[in-house]
Amino acid sequence: MADQSLLHSPINPHFFQPILTESRTHLNIPVAFFSKHVEGRNNQNKTVTLRSDASDKTWLVKMDGLKLTDGWEDFAFAHDLRTGDIVVFRLEGEMVFHVTALGPSCCEIQYHTSSHNINDDDRNDQINIASRNSSRVKKNPRKKVESSLDHSRFVAKVSAWCLSNDRLYIPLSFARLNGLNKINSKKIYLQNEEGRSWKLVLRHDKSGMQTFVQSGWRRFCSENGIRQGQYTFKLVRKSAPPVIRLCRAKAKPKQRSVAEYSSDHSCFEGSVTPSSLRNDLLYLPRSFVNSNRLDKRCSEIVLKNEQGVKWPLVLKRFKSVTYLPKGWTSFCQVNRIKAGDSFKFKLVGTWKKPVLSLCPTQSNNHKTPLECSEGNKSEESEEDCLEVKKKKYWSRCRASVENMDDDQTNIGNSSRKKRVSKNPREKVESSSDHSSFVGSVNPSSLYKDQLYLPRNFVSSNFLDKRCSEIVLKNERGEKRTLVLKHFKKDLTFLKKGWTSFCQVNRIKAGDSFKFKLVGTWNKPVLSLCPTETNYHKTPLACSEGNKSEESEEEGTEDKNTSQDCLEVKKRKYWSTCRASAENIDDDQTNIGNSSKEKRVKKNPVKKAESSSDHSSFVANVTASSLNYDRLYLPLSFVSSNGLDKMNGKEIVLLNEEGLSWKFNLKYNQAGKHTYVRPGWSRFCDANGMSQGQQFTFKLVQKHGPPVMYLSLSEHRPKSESSSHRSYFVGSVTASSIKKDKLYLWKSFVSSNGLDKGCKKIILKNKWGREWKLVLKHYKSNCFTIIKRGWTSFCQGNGLKAGDSFKFKLVGTGEKPVLSLCPAESSHEKIPLECPEGIDDVNSLSSNPSSGDDSSRSEESEEENMEDKNISQDCLETKKRKYCSSSSYSQNRFVTLTLTRSAFQTYKLVSFFNNYASRLS
């Protein structure tokens, strides 16, 4: 207790307070100390300054009467104050306090920082509060703190945030011990293991007590193959300019650098980084470029895979850096090279257009590139195939293949190994008689709705001169007419119908096919032959399809008449059904308010929120939130924490590493919803949050500005769709109710085949009532939504914004059925509608005469089609149905049959009047 005399010195007034559980957000000042030394001063309700021996930083804390409020939580967090500790405040000036922290045993807490503590350096790397990483050690002269004497090394954590913001944070302890915190806006050099140097800028932020390097960190990581993880750096020169060298950790396997090359100089090795795929760039090693003189004479270069397919790329130079832009990503996608895979290129041609040949490695020797339907053995056909690949993959492959690659890998993995021929050049080859050809379906052809035909097949059958249409026929004889297009006398392809043909015949990406030419007149016919992948498949049945195809065979002029008629009938029928159902829902909502209140009172514990803790909520990353760059907050969370009264104020989001993002808090009074913006999309990208995932946010500070903490590990709900693809779990958002839309997960849609020809979907609650909604697919943005009825479904089942739900797919086909399962927030809710519903009313009848009355009512409906003013009678009928007293016996049931004419004319009144008069 060397400082005991200072603590009890009568010269400086002081007081002490124990740290309790509620001391996390504020600390009380003793009344005697406040009245003697603080009360009566001009700044008693202003800010006090806190200092400590742990660091040179000062903290500004607001004094609100007898409490230290805003800023105290940061001070306690930085000094690792725990329940049971004691803090001593010594007044040293005008509202300036020196704070000393004591442990539960009244021993002073000693703070120290270890330069080799990986966790400490990780936090120092990105957390603004430096002393939070300090360890607490009791002051005991017999037990000294063991720490390493080598302060020339530090471990840096490379995160996605560091790469996107082009900066590397240096631990504060390392910067202080080596004097880097006193250097600002000076040059610093980073060296890789081979001694190559990169010039960066060293900066020091005094306000946040941070030291970091920038302006070149992203390029250093890209050229040295540094991905997300932990890397060791060593300071090899302290004098200006400082030099820091990259050292690979012994415990981690040696990472292969992009600049690594063999002693031969004709080849070089590297690894694919996420940034190279994202930026579509491949940097070439300087020694490889110089030794082969690629830096002077070349403007183009050709990449060739193991099968001989070539990709011409542009060779760019910027100062001393040589790289390949615009084409590297498509090359990796076609050859199935992913981030983290290693590669090796060999220079096989040194003329004006050099050729880099991809050599087999351990990571790609078992991979087969995406097949090309125009492939051939000759060099000329390879060039044609190259042109096709450029048009098929370069234009939209970057946007489509990333979303489709996972599905393609899962769908066609097992079958693709069997389909690949022994000679990889023979991907799509015409048969010897030129009347048939074999190919495979790739994602680009489905996405662009095009199928390229082999050149020799087209020329041998004279399809390039006289035809503008072609007919595809499946194994059942059903036909579909497509447009035949010719491009520059070299390319021939089918469009406007290829995707729908594959959907109907259940041909997916990765499946192989074989077509045979069976007709060579003005409209040739290609017949689909059975293969290993589709001989067991049955085409989707279409009730109107057979009629339309027969009409095609009978007369080509009326080929689409029945299909168009069917679509018109469907559109007319569903529009009337939706209008009537929405009107009935509104009436039932107004009528059944009192009865609903009685039902809800039976279980008053169940609120809209499943948890009583209003300091946290679960956020869904949806497509709309990413597109509109905003995050909607649940209404209960906002109202309970007073965030609806902070319109236009600033709010801070913290991730698990302590990095902060500032947003604006907006409250829409008309829609009564609160959201944060802008920057939500950037926040999701930096923290690896993707569409369809759920994350927990906790409000850790209510006082301005509010602070919400993101927990990535605490709440990642195990979506039952991942383990069982027939389930879909989500929560109701304010935007989904307002826009009458529900976004479905891509994995749920693709795994259950909902994107294959489905235009309608049925939602069913646990009482059996059904809602018919529209299922809409957006191929350009790769998402699927349910619309025109989602809001009425939520209203009918008592679902509000913030409630969670769970659907199970119980029926497939043209009209799949999603059944609502009981969830935590909705299993006690009773829908506004009775189990008999309005879409399907099937009840047991105890009175046989009711069936006769029903038939009479239907006959009267057919006879009186022009009566329109029955809304009041229908409303009175529903009032009897929902507000009826218990005097009606339970055995009085009736069977109702809802016909299309009933929906169109709103007529059930005749039967209801007869039934009501019979009851009276």
Curated annotation (Swiss-Prot):
Q: Note the superkingdom of the native organism.
A: Eukaryota
Keyword tags? DNA-binding, Nucleus, Repeat, Transcription, Transcription regulation
User: Which CDD domains does this UniProt record tie to the protein?
Assistant: B3_DNA
UniProt-annotated location(s): Nucleus
Please give the InterPro entries that the UniProt record associates with this protein.
B3_DNA-bd, DNA-bd_pseudobarrel_sf, REM_fam
Q: What is the first-listed, main subcellular location in coarse terms?
A: nucleus
What GO molecular-function term can you cite, just one? DNA binding
Specify the DNA-binding region ranges. 12-105, 153-250, 267-361, 436-531, 616-714, 727-823
- Its signal peptide is none
Bias kind Low complexity: ranges = 842-852
Q: Where is this region: Disordered?
A: 405-438, 540-562, 585-614, 842-870
Quote the biased-composition stretches of kind Basic and acidic residues, using this chain's numbering.
423-432
Q: Which GO terms describe its cellular component?
A: chloroplast; nucleus
- Pfam families with a match to the protein in the record: B3 (PF02362)
This protein's name: B3 domain-containing protein REM17
| Encoding gene (name) | REM17
